[in-house]
Amino acid sequence: MEITEVRVFPVNEEKLKAYVTITLDHCFVIRDLKVIHGNTGLFIAMPAKRRKDGTFKDIAHPLNSDTREKMERTILAEYDRELKKGGAAPARATGTDPHED
C-alpha cells in the first residue's frame, strides 16, 4: 500500500491542527483524518463515528503499528510542508473544506 496523495486542511483550534484526506494507490480515498496536538506532540487520529453511548469507533484504521507509523510520518511531513508554505495554520477559507469535491 502506498499513500499517493495527502491533502492537508489546517484549522485554528487549540488541539485540532488540521483535517487530512489521503489517497491510497491512486484508487482509494480516506477523509477526515485529523492532526491533533496532544500531551506528547502531534499525532494522527483516524476518522471515527460517535456511537449511541457517546464513545467513538474508528471507521478506518491501520491493522498494525508499522503501517500506522508510516501513515503518521507521511501525513505529518505533509502537514509541516503545508505550514511552511502558508506560515501559521490559517482559518479555513472558502473552497478549502475537506468535505468538498
UniProtKB/Swiss-Prot annotation:
<keyword id="KW-0717">Septation</keyword>
<dbReference type="InterPro" id="IPR036751">
    <property type="entry name" value="SpoVG_sf"/>
</dbReference>
<keyword id="KW-0131">Cell cycle</keyword>
<dbReference type="Pfam" id="PF04026">
    <property type="entry name" value="SpoVG"/>
</dbReference>
<keyword id="KW-0132">Cell division</keyword>
<comment type="function">
    <text>Could be involved in septation.</text>
</comment>
<protein>
    <recommendedName>
        <fullName>Putative septation protein SpoVG</fullName>
    </recommendedName>
</protein>
<dbReference type="InterPro" id="IPR007170">
    <property type="entry name" value="SpoVG"/>
</dbReference>
<feature type="region of interest" description="Disordered">
    <location>
        <begin position="82"/>
        <end position="101"/>
    </location>
</feature>
<comment type="similarity">
    <text>Belongs to the SpoVG family.</text>
</comment>
<dbReference type="GO" id="GO:0030435">
    <property type="term" value="P:sporulation resulting in formation of a cellular spore"/>
</dbReference>
<dbReference type="GO" id="GO:0000917">
    <property type="term" value="P:division septum assembly"/>
</dbReference>
